Amino acid sequence: MEKHGDYDIKKICVIGLGYIGLPTASMLANHGYDVVGVDVNEKRVNQIKNGELKIEEPGLLTLVKGAINSKNLNVRTSATEADAFIICVPTPALAKEDGSKKCDLSYVMSAVEAILPFVKDGNLIVIESTIPPETTKKIYETLNKKIYVAHCPERVLPGKILKELVENDRIIGGINKKSAEMAKEIYKSFVEGQIYTTDSNTAEMVKLMENTYRDINIALANEFAKICDEIGVNVWDAIKIANKHPRVNILNPGPGVGGHCISIDPWFIVEKTNNAKFIRAARELNDNMPAYVCNSVLSELKKLGIEKPKISIFGATYKGNVEDTRESPSKNVIKMLLENGATVSTYDPHASYFEYPLSTLDECISGSDCIVVLTDHDVFKTIKKDDIDEICPKLKNKIVFDTKNILEHSLWKKAGFTVKLLGNGAW
């Protein structure tokens, strides 16, 4: 193939074929690069080869098939020689004794070790995985090779990954200027947004700042919800009106924060400094929302004389219209309900995997005392009168607790339901 730009980068090895790695590898292959996609999960590799994706992402299957059919994308379980290596592996958070969390870099370091035998002088390594500040530099210092290393954090939203891979601005931080410029050469082959280059420490911090900002905003909304529950105000109405101010943009409250970014990344700042007390407080507030929801549900049921209830959970994924259950608040809500003697069934038409059993809709609601909505799937938003009429006879008690404010409450009330809304103290 012809080389791209000023640097002789023709072959790229992408390590990790998950939510970020597979779309990135496929995008590069469809833009002319010779790409080897690597994943240690042999089952996943075979599924990709056979066009059987477990990632529910619009347009991804077509993109992957196009890349494989063009012969530009080959997937395998081991690394190989290349001009550039892109690491797209998870960086989960590990719990610490003091109640905080820290970044688990084991997947990143395993990826580095896997490619090390194939890395030659002059090669480029790009780390897309979200990492704490100073990590890129430390990895470079351990390699003892004349290579280039950069950090280009992913910045996409599940459900819109392909669109945002192309349209979003990107930041690339290098351990030196040439590292950043080499990485930029690769990404500008498909990125239509602006690409900003800086040093690796800054790039690492920028990604963490972006998600920390959102986490803190959500924590503020959740604290407002708790206050409004106490003082007799509907927080949703209050936020809507407050946001009419041109310099106010409060996000919505909910049962907690999940996913692989917002619920994790702020901890990577906290672990680096003692000056992140506000960030830690926000993170802890959001982590405690499942307990608040659990206690609110059980308290309301107890007021109605319902002990040891059967509860129907609507939603296992961490956000609407995706199949991703990583760090989902639903897990902790269910865990706490079970610990408090409730029987719990869970319905989610999107989730492909969950720590707790998933039921059909009929199984979930049969004999139930209460429906608790935890995820804002469109299928829940669009429940209409006829659907409610079908649900009613299967329930033991007509109670619904909406933590996302997505149901048409008037329809449920007309059907005889008691409707409870998170953050609505004006019940």
Curated annotation (Swiss-Prot):
This is UDP-N-acetyl-D-mannosamine dehydrogenase. The keyword rRNA-binding does not apply. The active site is at K207 (proton donor/acceptor), C261 (nucleophile). NAD(+) binds at Y19, I20, D39, R44, T91, T130, R326. GO terms for biological process: polysaccharide biosynthetic process. PANTHER family: UDP-N-ACETYL-D-MANNOSAMINE DEHYDROGENASE. It is an enzyme of class 1 (oxidoreductase). Homotetramer; probably dimer of dimers. Belongs to the UDP-glucose/GDP-mannose dehydrogenase family. GO terms for molecular function: NAD binding; oxidoreductase activity, acting on the CH-CH group of donors, NAD or NADP as acceptor; oxidoreductase activity, acting on the CH-OH group of donors, NAD or NADP as acceptor; UDP-N-acetyl-D-mannosamine dehydrogenase activity. Catalyzes the four-electron oxidation of UDP-N-acetyl-D-mannosamine (UDP-ManNAc), reducing NAD(+) and releasing UDP-N-acetylmannosaminuronic acid (UDP-ManNAcA). Cannot use NADP instead of NAD. Its EC number is 1.1.1.336. UDP-N-acetyl-alpha-D-mannosaminouronate binds at R155, V156, K207, N211, R214, H245, R247, G258, Y318, K319, K404. Keywords: NAD, Oxidoreductase. It comes from Methanococcus maripaludis (strain DSM 14266 / JCM 13030 / NBRC 101832 / S2 / LL).
